[in-house]
């Protein structure tokens, strides 16, 4: 019996539903002191003086530390595997606290008190003297001569620049009869809005620092804490229990280094830091706002002669994940619609906004909005159905990327497009809605494709480890460094392990928490990598454990290993399937045999030197109220080729979650900042327009299963892709309904009113 491919219940569902699941805050020592951070209320300034005497004198305050008290060990925060090559290491530009304020919310002091209320009161007693500096919020203005400089090491505020050149762009655009289509596209700064705010607590044990934290990347956080404190990494232990979502925000070391340092300054006493929602909004990480400029030179039949992309990514105040986001988005441009003559450039620049980091999609939602909006602009210029255009130009089967050398093994783009078009009746509806509409309610349909890599090879290391232990009752314990953050990977790993070893699903226990003292190494949850990369480690370890079990069965039965098999937790004879013994019987004998006691375990590391393309598309149907300037999404469908589905119900849930995120990206979500001060204006769940359940349309997920040949279980990326294509599909549906092209999201009523007025569709 194979468990891969079955919709088994989540292994953590009962504990979470019953409230038994223990998160970092639930595990916090009741004696722990509370630390609250003083965030600067300036966009750009030097801290000249901090007077904390009143705060220190308050009852219940244990200590106050300022930016002048902390060690000057610069460290990176991005959750990437360590590189032994200095040029590939993340930028180390952070201190525990800083005297150079680079955004409104930067950390300049911390109060440690016996309780949270006292700590908050003490913060209000701290007086700060600033030397104000000019600031810049716009990414292109930050690159202009004379703009305020944020980091001496990066002249012109440019953190990174990359380019792609293929063919001869200038020669190609001279071809007679070409149609030039040009557009500028903007995506906003948004926040992850995971349920659980970031929190951590730290203490000392045996001269070592222990941090219990809500993180996606425990093994990487250990290294970063060591760097920040200037101590050997082995002197740090990180424990990751259940966590309530992350979406990339927790793929940075956020406050773990500061929390760890505080316990070292307070005699090893436990100290906790828990972010308020307002802090999470603008003091953690945000999604990069990216401005894109695209020019396509198109033949009348829809084929491209030449294409150009320029994009500018707003990094905010610190490097975090840096230029990788813009570079990944740029690299998708020549792949999704191959063209022989390409010029691409991407820049990432510092501004005085909150640091931008990883967020679900890692640059692809921004690139997909710009790229897919542009494709519909091209189809409109050609007077061609957008589906027909994409049929002509989408990445073909057998395509090999010139740079990564990854190969597209399937014709998934077309399979997904056709499945979605048929299910939504797209071609008929598009033609119907394209006819002139004059009423106050107008309808339209739109579509968008996406492309996504699985993991980070060959840009960075991809490896994963797994340990399996045969317990005396015949059950299997599985440990891996890959992290469950709410997406369901523990369930998927249990299904994989059951198949790899040959035991029932119910007898597999995946240890959900990670502890860097005992858990095998894994990079963690990011890049939609865990099912693919972790699957290699589970398959390799499972095969090794199975081999050792059958070797011991050979000892007990005196039968050749080649005649034995392990099926559903039973040792059977291959020729006739006769059950020889239960695995529990073998395990007990192995543990307690006076003649040959064996603790049957297996551990293996898999280094992955392959990558897999995931493909898909979104189809949207909208209703536009021309009088109220409101968009109502009537139907949204995502179609995915994510390889073989390990658990179809979990896959569907992933898609629905991503579609919800894409809806907000399209219609409502945007962090706003005061242009005169740099202060965030809507850093809370009341003013930040996160969509509610009532705002969601009918959402559907379709899958075109196509087993990935490089994967031991046929899997590839699904975690992030569902968020990539809904926004441009909705934008394109509005174009179909109204004839008006919107080149920025979110498409709010205010934006609709302004554009409709410019187009002469509404009166004052």
Where are the model-predicted features located?
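Flexible, low-hydrophobicity surface segments
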Residues: 1-155, 183, 267, 593
């Amino acid at each position: 019996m194979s468990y891969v491919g079955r919709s088994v219940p989540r292994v953590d569902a009962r504990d979470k539903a019953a409230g038994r699941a223990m998160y970092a805050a639930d595990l916090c020592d009741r004696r722990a002191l509370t630390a609250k951070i003083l965030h600067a209320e300036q966009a750009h300034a030097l801290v000249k003086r901090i007077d904390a005497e009143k705060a220190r004198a308050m009852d219940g305050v244990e200590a106050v530390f300022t930016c002048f008290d902390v060690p000057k060990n610069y460290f990176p925060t991005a959750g990437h595997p360590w590189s032994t090559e200095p040029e590939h290491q993340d930028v180390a530009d952070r201190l525990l606290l800083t005297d150079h304020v680079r955004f409104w919310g930067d950390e300049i002091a911390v109060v440690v008190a016996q309780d949270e209320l006292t700590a908050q009161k003490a913060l209000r007693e701290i007086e700060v003297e600033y030397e104000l500096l000019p600031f810049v919020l716009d990414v292109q203005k930050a690159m202009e001569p004379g703009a305020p400089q944020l980091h001496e090491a990066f002249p012109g505020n440019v953190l990174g620049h990359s380019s792609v050149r293929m063919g001869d762009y200038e020669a190609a655009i001279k071809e007679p009869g070409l149609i030039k289509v040009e557009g500028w596209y903007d995506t906003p700064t948004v926040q992850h809005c995971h349920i659980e705010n970031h929190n951590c607590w730290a203490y000392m044990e045996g001269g070592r620092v222990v941090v219990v934290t809500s993180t996606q990347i425990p093994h990487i956080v250990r290294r970063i804490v060591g760097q920040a404190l200037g101590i050997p990494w082995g002197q740090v232990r990180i424990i990751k229990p259940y966590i309530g979502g992350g979406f990339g925000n927790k793929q940075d070391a956020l406050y773990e280094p500061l929390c760890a340092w505080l316990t070292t300054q307070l005699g090893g006493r436990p100290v906790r830091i828990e972010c308020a929602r307002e802090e999470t909004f603008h003091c953690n990480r945000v999604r990069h706002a990216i401005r894109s400029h695209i020019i396509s030179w198109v033949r009348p039949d829809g084929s491209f002669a030449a294409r150009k992309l320029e994009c500018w990514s707003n990094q905010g105040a610190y490097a975090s994940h840096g230029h990788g986001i813009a570079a990944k988005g740029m690299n998708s441009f020549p792949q999704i619609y191959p063209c022989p003559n390409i010029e691409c450039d991407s820049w990432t620049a510092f501004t005085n906004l909150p640091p931008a980091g990883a967020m679900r999609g890692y640059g692809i939602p921004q690139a997909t909005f710009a790229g897919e909006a542009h494709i519909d602009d091209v189809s409109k210029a050609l007077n061609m159905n957008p589906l027909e255009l994409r049929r002509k130009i989408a990445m073909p089967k057998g395509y090999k990327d010139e740079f990564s050398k990854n190969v597209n093994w399937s014709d998934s783009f077309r399979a997904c497009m056709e499945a979605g078009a048929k299910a939504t009746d797209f071609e008929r509806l598009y033609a119907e809605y394209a006819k002139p509409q004059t009423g106050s309610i107008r309808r339209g349909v739109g579509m968008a494709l996406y492309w996504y890599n699985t993991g980070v090879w060959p840009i960075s290391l991809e490896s994963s480890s797994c340990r399996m232990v045969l317990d005396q009752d015949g059950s299997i314990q599985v440990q891996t460094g890959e992290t469950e953050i709410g997406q369901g990977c523990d369930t998927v790993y249990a299904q994989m392990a059951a198949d790899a070893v040959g035991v029932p699903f119910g007898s597999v226990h995946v240890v959900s928490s990670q502890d860097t003292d005992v858990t095998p190494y894994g990079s963690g949850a990011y890049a939609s990598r865990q099912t693919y990369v972790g699957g290699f480690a589970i398959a390799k370890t499972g095969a090794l454990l199975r081999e050792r079990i059958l070797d011991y069965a050979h000892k007990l039965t005196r039968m050749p290993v080649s005649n034995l098999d392990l099926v559903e937790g039973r040792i059977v004879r291959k020729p006739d399937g006769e059950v020889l013994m239960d695995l529990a019987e073998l395990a007990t004998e192995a543990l307690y045999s006076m003649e040959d006691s064996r603790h049957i375990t297996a551990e293996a590391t898999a280094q992955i030197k392959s990558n897999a393309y995931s493909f898909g598309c979104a189809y949207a149907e909208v209703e536009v109220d021309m009088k109220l300037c409101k968009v109502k999404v009537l139907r949204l469908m995502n179609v995915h080729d994510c390889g073989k589905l390990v658990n179809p119900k979990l896959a569907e849930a992933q898609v629905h979650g991503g579609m919800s995120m894409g809806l907000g990206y399209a219609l409502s979500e945007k962090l706003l900042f005061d242009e005169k001060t740099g202060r965030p204006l809507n850093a809370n769940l009341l003013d930040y327009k996160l969509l509610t359940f009532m705002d969601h349309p009918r959402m559907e997920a379709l899958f075109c299963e196509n087993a990935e040949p490089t994967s031991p279980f046929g899997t590839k990326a699904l975690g992030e892709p569902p968020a990539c294509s809904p926004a441009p599909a909705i934008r394109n549906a509005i174009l179909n309904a109204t004839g008006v092209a919107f080149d920025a999201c979110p498409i709010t009523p205010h934006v609709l009113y302004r554009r409709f007025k410019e187009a002469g569709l509404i009166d004052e």
